[in-house]
Amino acid sequence: MTSNHYLGAAAAGFIVLLAACAAQTQQSADGVTIGDSDLGGVVTSATGPEAGVWVIAETTDLPTKYAKMVVTDERGRYVVPGLPRASYNVWVRGYGLVDSPKVRTAPGKLLNLTAVPAPNDAAAAQYYPAIYWYSMLQIPPAGEFGGYTRIPKDRTQADWLKQVKNIGCIGCHQLGQSSTRTIPSAFADIKSSEEAWVRRLQSGQSGEQMTNQLAGNFGGAPYKYYADWTDRIAKGELPFAKPPRPQGVERNLVVTSWEWSTEKHYLHDLIASDRRNPTVNSYGPLFGSPEYSTDNMPILDPRTHKVTTFKMPVADPSMPEALGPGHAASLRPLAPSAYWGEEKLWDTRANNHNAMFDKQGRVWMAATVRDRPNPAFCKKGSEHPSAKVFPLEMSSRQVAMLDPKTMKYTFIDTCFGTHHPQFGYDADNTLWLSGTGPVAGWVNTKVFEQTGDAARSQGWAPFVLDTNGNGRLDEFIDPKSPIDPSKDKQIIPGSGPYAVMPSPVDGSIWYTVGVFGGPPGFLRFDPKTRLSEVYHVPAPYFGIRGGDIDKDGVAWGSASSGHLASFDRRKCKGPLNGPKATGDHCPEGWSFYQYPGPGFRGLGENSAESSYYTWVDQHNTLGLGENVPMSTANLNDGFVALKDGKMILLRIPYPLGFYAKGFDGRIDDPGAGWKGRGLWSTNGDRTPWLMEGGKGAKPRAVQIQLRPDPLAR
């Protein structure tokens, strides 16, 4: 072949390559560039470009319902990147708008969309996050506490706020979305709204727990306030505040969601990776924790969009269900549901509350393996080293491990209860648990792998303050005895450990404590000395729920007062042990950052946000940087991050009513930029049918990613 032939062939190949590139990308006159798997265009209304609104693309063509959501830039431009090949419904949603008509299309097209301004404030308010409606709830003024009204004498205004926020009602549900700010039609014939609320909260397998909280703990007084709230809304009262549209970096979010589990079963959490090593399980499946709802663990493969289930076993198949006394759900509905009648929905034995990956890619769960009474090695008279110090009679949940490679499920019978698991940073890969009651509890997973002996692999120890100040664990007095400066003192930290957080700095173990009773705060346990320190939330702040720790050893938590709380032990000025170091000795270690959103009126500056859990992005899995604390924003339809002193909202705009109890971060490909990393979570409301979509709606797993700009592909 001559050189001219070579040149001719090369030129032809170059032309083909150019044609292929042209087919792969398109650019609009507005500067929107898309590829074959993208959608892009401009959103406008009669008033011009619509900035900071969402474009939502959803399909049912894949193995499970799938949606991807983005935010428009300052010129109304958008790009929905990386859509699987399918046919999509696409529409616009935003504050000040009503949903636009859905347009049917496929990826690879430039698609301009027309937004629809809301005809009035009432129509616009239907799309507001729940907090804008829930903040309309009236709170009894301070003068109504102290035994002068129906409110029991021993209940304070802070107790009331904890109940109507993240320690009580918002601990299981988002209140303020459409389903909860109205009365179900099934109860419409009840003669008074207050009686309708009494009946409503008796419904289903949580009816007993809800009734005990409001009628038992608060004398039934809250019913009146909830009735007044829904009455005012039914008469046309609207939120007194309006939500701002996403601004700045909030417009760079890409949210992807998949339906999973069933319309009758909720999920408490999901797990994606090892929080210490977030490249573990890269591009791998997500595992859901269905808690009280079912033994069927949903597993989502985000690459194929397929959802499968694994039925979690228990060691004794004849054991009773993990429902009823000792649990936060009942065997049967207290009264028929407005949605499901007398049907019993929940039937779990495994009761998988929460899970964590280890560095080998195995899933370790806080899950029930047998009935509540403990085996003999846990009890008084046992030769187990921990039982000699502090015997334990029963536990309602233990530990299990699933190996996704083989799907082998292993039981680890613990004497202490479990709730949230977290791996430490030690050579033994110690698994630390919360929900352990009066003790710190752990499993040495290295020993368990070597021996398979659950008894030998576990340990526990009571929480003991070094009140004699000598730095050693000595003879200690019981929790009810007054301080003796010559001895140490055991404490029961209120309702016990709730969140658990091993420190990457010094190996100490931190917990949130006093969540459901007793003084709330953080507790530090030293595995080497077996000594504890406790730090109470200082007034005027109150309450705490989930928490985490950052790479500097600073503890962070979701405070009931509507704040992200932090505690830095390094700021303490006085002694950390001794007879005065009993919880109130270091207020200077605390800092508080108010969550976004309106507050309840009559209480001064506050936020009604009722965050369930806080997590620290130690490894920049989202893209805001390392060591960024984030909280579930349970009334703001998503999450909130604290970056450089500013709160950044990470909203899930669809379906309305997104409510999470936790989240995780994963780096699938460190070299793939924003596409290779993201946060993962799932809708965790106990009643999926209360979110947008109503009866038949399923929980959604979500991935949140952060682009460098709203048009990045």
Predicted regions located by residue number:
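Short, ordered, surface-exposed loop/turn motifs in non-cytosolic proteins
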Residues: S45-D61, R85, Y134-G146
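Short, conserved, GDST-rich strand-edge loop motifs in beta-rich repeat architectures
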Residues: S179-A186, N281, G288-Y292, A322-L323, ...
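Structural signature of eukaryotic scaffold interfaces centered on beta-propeller domains
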Residues: E259-S282, E342-Q360, H420-D428, K489-D506, ...
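Short Pro-Gly-centered beta-turn/loop motif in secreted/extracellular proteins
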Residues: P49-E50, V79-S87, Y95
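Short, acidic Ser/Thr/Gly-rich low-complexity loop/linker segments typical of extracellular
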Residues: T33, T60-G82
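A short, solvent-exposed loop/turn motif at the edges and junctions
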Residues: T59-K65, S87, W91-G108
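The canonical Cys-X-X-Cys-His
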Residues: N166-Q177
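Surface loop/turn motifs at the tips and blade-to-blade linkers of beta-strand repeat domains
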Residues: H268-L270, F310-V314, E343-T348, F411-F416, ...
